[in-house]
Amino acid sequence: MSHAPPLGALLRQYAAGSALTCDPVEQGLLNRGYRLRTTRGRYFLKHHFDPETADPLAIARQHRATQRLADLGVPVAPPLTGTDGRTVAVIGGHAYALHPWIDGRHRHGGQLTTQQCARLGALLGVVHASLERVMPTQGRTPARPSDVTGATDGSAGAGGSARADAGGSAAAEGVDPARGADAADTFALIDRLLAQVRRHRPYDAFDELARHRLLERRALLERHADRRPPQGGSVGWVHGDFHPFNLLYRDGEPAAIVDWDRLGVHPRAEEAVRAAVIFFVRPVGALDLAKVRAYARAYRRTASAGPAELAAAVHRVWWERLNDFWMLRWHYERGDTRADPQFPAASALAVWWTREYDTVCEAFAG
């Protein structure tokens, strides 16, 4: 097993018995996870591998947050505490955490009823409202968004690290996190990507679609370049990566929200919009607006968020999507094709959303 964790030392630190089996779960982009069965039970062992989120102090902070959320009844899976009183084990310079194993499955919005979509929106609203209660209020300034988004892969264990197209990547260099991408930077990025597409050999169907979408997006940006959003609105503590692969369902109900590595201070309503866009996008690149409406109304109610806050968030996330090419950058600049299956729907969504802008705003804020 590659990257095998130091099970002996870890299990001693958590007094979790002796290992019987240890199997890697489907490997996430940012961290590594293992389904661990010992003489004392079943666990999810998480190796915090991503340098951006592997600081033990930051991990301990998100652990404390999930413990407090659990006390409020939010479905989370807080880590176990070691014999030293800590939840983070640092062994050989690597940070680990041990969580209870949560049986469950991931569900996309297409697998949810309208009523379940409303419960999903209410759940995220409860998360945001609860974080306001359990996290410090001093020094609440928006964190700089990561320039990395992830490929869609998931794990069924508590605390798993799975990432999907959160649409939050900085599509162009020099992004002002308070205002979003500058169209001039995006035009330069489009030109660079087009040159890479032309040079790619053998030229295939993905290259043809990429070229088509890049030219299409450039035309859209030329028409809408003056719609860059103003300074962002009110901020609060958010999960930071709320999407189908970080939510486990059991018997039709949410069992656990996992992967809190991106816990931070950001505009709350933008997380609600990004999550809905991921949950409710159809393969053709359109949103299921009936489900969006049910979700958004429930979110606004439980998060005490007004229509104007949601409408502003819709505009900012739309602009973010219009300027976002992280999947193509992975494909052509990194040679990483894991996100390729997402590209057809994600790239079509920006076009559809621009055409149906008012209808989408109404679904979230009406």
Located regions from the model:
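Juxta-kinase regulatory segment immediately upstream of eukaryotic protein kinase catalytic domains
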Residues: 1-20
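Protein kinase glycine-rich loop
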Residues: 23-27
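Active-site acidic catalytic loop and adjacent metal/ATP-binding pocket
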Residues: 29-37, 44-45, 79, 224-270
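ATP-binding pocket architecture of kinase catalytic cores
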Residues: 39-141, 170
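A cross-family kinase active-site recognition segment
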Residues: 110-211, 235
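ATP/Mg2+ or Mg2+-diphosphate-binding catalytic cores
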Residues: 154, 165, 192, 196-200, ...
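Membrane-embedded hairpin module used as a gating/binding unit in multi-pass transport
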Residues: 196, 213-224
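Active-site activation/catalytic loop segments of kinase-like enzymes and analogous catalytic loops
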Residues: 269-304, 317-336
